[in-house]
Amino acid sequence: MSNPEIVIVVAMAANNVIGRDGDMPWKLSTDLKRFKALTLGKPLVMGRKTFESVGGKPLPGRPHVIVSRGAEIAMPGVSMARSLEEALERAREIAIETGVDEVCIAGGGEIYRQALPFADVLHVTHVDAEVDGDTVFPEIDPALFEKVQETPVPAGEKDNYPTRYAVYRRRTAA
């Protein structure tokens, strides 16, 4: 099997905000369903604070690789890594062992910033709002990533805002 693609999955506001006080600054049930569909069965890389923000236990059906310089988390379905590079290496091994073609990056802000140079694909939920927050996603450089798909999604009854699902693919060197 070839090397699995590195896929970032993120929801961000129009002003690039992705978090506030260790949580997402919106409720988007529709987007959570999309996140599950995109990541199910695939290794999920996230930082320790993000892991704690999703309940401190693995999301079902996805092997987790948690990046932490200090805390050790010992539980089934969770591997630990001291750096993003180590986490990506472990997640790639898991992907190859389990026969999946993607490794998913699920945040938070620092992990996204470090992972962007390695990413092949970005699955971005653009939240049609500007919100206050303390964590932002880096600018997506159109010279590096081409938007290959965008779908408007009206706000459902359990969503604070309408969104647009976009897929960006890394441009290949000419």
Explain the meaning of each model-derived region.
Residues 2-174:
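Enzymes that bind and transform nitrogen-containing heteroaromatic metabolites
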